[in-house]
Amino acid sequence: NMEGTIVIGEGEMDEAPMLYIGERLGTLNGPKFDIAVDPLEGTKFTANNEPNAFSVIAVANKGDLLSAPDTYMEKIAVGANLPKNLLDIDFGVEKNIKLLAKAKNKKISDLNVCVLKRPRHDEIVKVLTKMNVHINYIQDGDIAGVLSVIGEEPKNDIYYSTGGGPEGVLAAAALSCYGGQMQGRLVLNEEEKIRAKKLGIKDFNRKYNIDDMVRGDVIFCATGVTSGDLTKGVKDLGNEFEVTTFALHKSKKINKIITNIYNKWIRFQ
């Protein structure tokens, strides 16, 4: 008994048959929620049976999730237990890396930086290479890249790339449950600015901190399609499928893996 509104989905109403931005779900009575979804994060991974493809949803109270257009977003993300507002996109790569190394009491050469492997990041890579940090490239999967900075022994110290705007908000939902930090700024052409205006975005140069993207309590779930860093993939058990979900709830400090078994022959209406 709830009213959910899709704020991040499969596109605008004329682009998607379902889960479009603005679509309302539920009984339309009871509590109101924002819903952000990415039904398949990592389409290439799925097609090639490579790791880190999953289905993602985040749910927050009405008005608490940034409704980001399907455009690029500059992003930097780090884990928990660091000084607040430590990094800033406008500081530049070199200054941010030096600040991070000092805050983590690490040598710069011991830092691990996750970068989405794209030509647009060549300048970032040049600076990182000159600073002699470890660069861990990912081919796709922006959300998994951001989430590689979480945990007691994270794979990476920082995520530094320009990826999808909607994926940025979904990643911020999970990162906020861990007390991590993130900053993003939308990269918009003239046509995209028109779409952004429709979503209520007025300042096209605004830098969004994690509390701007996820303003309060949030639930985040990622269900594995292929096995990866977050979850196992779907497992065929003959007449059944085993499905694994990575679940977080910020206010209740829930962080757990949920495994469910589904009968292959049941059709969901």
What are these regions (language model features)?
Residues 61-100:
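Glycine-rich phosphate-binding loop plus the immediately following alpha-helix
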Residues 1-3, 28-33, 41, 49-54, ...:
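Short coil/turn connectors at secondary-structure junctions
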Residues 91-240, 244-249:
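An extended, acidic
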Residues 60-61, 65-71, 138, 185-190:
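Short, acidic/small-residue loops that bind anionic groups at enzyme active sites
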Residues 54-55, 75, 263-267:
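A short local loop/turn or secondary-structure capping micro-motif enriched for an aromatic residue
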Residues 4-10, 35-37, 46-48, 67-68, ...:
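General beta-strand structural signal in soluble alpha/beta enzymes
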Residues 1-62:
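Flexible, acidic active-site loops/lids enriched in D/E/S/T/G that coordinate Mg2+ and/or position polar
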Residues 238-269:
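Extended hydrophobic packing segments that form well-structured cores
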